[in-house]
Design a protein with these regions (language model features):
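Phosphate-binding loop and its immediate beta->loop->alpha context
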Residues: 26-165
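Gly/Thr-rich phosphate-binding beta-strand-loop-beta motif of the actin/hexokinase/Hsp70
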Residues: 2-31
Length: 165
């Protein structure tokens, strides 16, 4: 499809949507962010499931719509042992939790100095991990489009985040 080897990827990590482009010696091509979809952008959302499944974009939204209602009560949760202490904050609050999370607004959270992680299933998900779910999905799309495994990435960021003085 492309002549020449790609030299870098460029990512626009947006609040709502993100995009990726492949840079060659003589040109830059924005590539579809999700295989099989006509759009060039990927929804900047991360899906987390207690079993370790991680998704980004439309796949994240679709998975959450199908599985978002599933939950565990603490009596049936492998993270909480009868009579034992637990790191699960949900167990101490209301005795149950959802099996899935759809994390939105990750870019907004980057601007917050008081936010470093979100907590689910007795574990903290660092902000960098949430961002990486989206970035890794974008990279897979660019690898598929370019036929290469490019390791060089260019990303910009706002000089000042909206709402910050």
């Amino acid at each position: 499809m492309n002549s020449g080897d790609p030299i870098a990827y460029g990512i626009d990590f947006g609040t709502s949507n993100s995009a990726i482009a492949v840079a060659y010696d003589d040109r830059v091509e924005v590539v579809p962010a999700e295989s099989g979809l006509a759009g060039l952008t990927l929804a900047s959302v991360a899906y987390l499931h207690r079993d370790g499944d991680r998704q980004a974009g439309e796949a994240a939204i679709a998975r959450y719509l199908v599985q978002g209602h599933l939950h565990h009560t603490c009596l049936h949760c492998p993270l909480v042992r009868y009579g034992a202490e637990t790191e699960c904050k949900q167990a101490t609050r209301n005795g149950g939790c959802q099996d899935t999370r759809l994390v939105t607004g990750v870019k907004r959270d980057l601007a917050r100095t008081d936010f470093t992680a979100t907590h689910s299933w007795a574990q903290d998900f660092e902000l960098a991990e949430l961002v990486s779910i989206v970035i890794e999905r974008l990279k897979r799309s660019a690898d598929e489009a370019s036929g290469a495994d490019v390791r060089r990435l260019v990303m910009g960021h706002p000089v000042v985040f909206a709402g910050m003085d």
